[in-house]
Structure formats: structure tokens, C-alpha cells
Design a protein with these regions (language model features):
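Residues lining hydrophobic/aromatic ligand-binding pockets adjacent to catalytic sites
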Residues: 1-151
Length: 151
């Protein structure tokens, strides 16, 4: 977890117009799985807010086994996340995309809360390209792995 002074140092070393898109610490996303993560999230946000005008969007990459059964944890987390900090979420578990009602419920949550859905372009997972925008901003995650023929 970066300390506020470290964030200030990074901010001050970058040119005007530069934007940081920091990933939420894995202690929150993977170890706590968004459960009882309020204090850690507050500490994280207190640090990254020091990016000031250079803060682009914060992204939450969920564990690949964080599926729809954890919807309530996800909803609680994004509903409480500070609205002054733009948030994007990457749903990695395929169960989010296999059922239209689950898919719609997750995206409705994101649209309601102003959370950007991360669009993922991953070799071997072209099925994920069906995802939709949930805010006016696009966050596209290009993931390369051993450069498959489809890349």
C-alpha cells in the first residue's frame, strides 16, 4: 500500500497531462475479497487521492474465483467506495458472463453507482468482447500472453 508521501513523489515526477490508473491493493481484492475492507480502502484512498489532478481512474481487479455468489460483497463495496474517486472493476470469473440475468445485474449495479466496467481483450478469451460500457469512459485492458496466433 503506497504511503501518501510516496504518491506525492510519483505525482511530482511526472509531466503535466500524465494520468495514474492505480490498481486497488490485493490485500483488499484478493485476500479480504472486499469483506471487512473499509479501513484498508480508506487508507488506500487517502494515499491515492494525493495524485490530485493526475489521478485517472482506480481499478479493482477481482480474483478469478470471485463469482456471482459474491455479488452482495461487490455491491456493498462499490456502493461505499468514495464517489470522488473514479472506479473501474474487472470481473474475471466466467460465471459473470454465462448467465444474462447475472450479467445484467452486475452491469446495472455499475451503471447505478457510476463504476466503469473494464473491457478485457485477452488472447483466447474473445468471448469477453461482448461486454458493454457502464459509464461514458472506456477502460480497455489489453492482456498479452505468449502472443497467440489471434494476437
Amino acid at each position: 500500500m503506497p504511503k501518501p508521501q510516496q504518491v506525492i513523489t510519483w505525482r511530482d515526477k511526472t509531466p503535466d497531462g500524465f494520468r495514474f490508473l492505480p490498481k486497488i491493493n490485493q490485500m483488499i481484492s484478493h485476500m479480504r475479497r472486499l469483506n471487512n475492507a473499509e479501513m484498508l480502502t480508506e487508507e488506500y484512498c487517502d494515499s491515492i487521492i494525493q495524485f490530485e489532478e493526475k489521478l485517472g481512474m482506480v481499478f479493482l481487479q477481482l480474483h478469478d474465483n470471485f463469482g456471482p455468489k459474491n455479488f452482495d460483497l461487490l455491491a456493498n463495496y462499490v456502493e461505499k467506495f468514495p464517489k470522488a474517486i473514479p472506479l473501474a472493476v474487472e470481473l474475471r470469473n466466467t460465471e459473470w458472463f454465462n448467465n444474462e440475468s447475472v450479467f445484467s445485474k452486475a452491469y446495472q449495479l455499475f451503471e447505478t453507482e457510476g463504476v466503469t466496467n473494464i473491457l478485457v481483450d485477452t488472447a483466447g478469451r474473445r468471448d469477453l468482447l461482448h461486454m458493454r460500457l457502464t459509464t461514458p469512459n472506456a477502460f480497455i485492458w489489453y492482456v498479452g500472453a505468449n502472443y497467440s496466433e489471434s494476437d
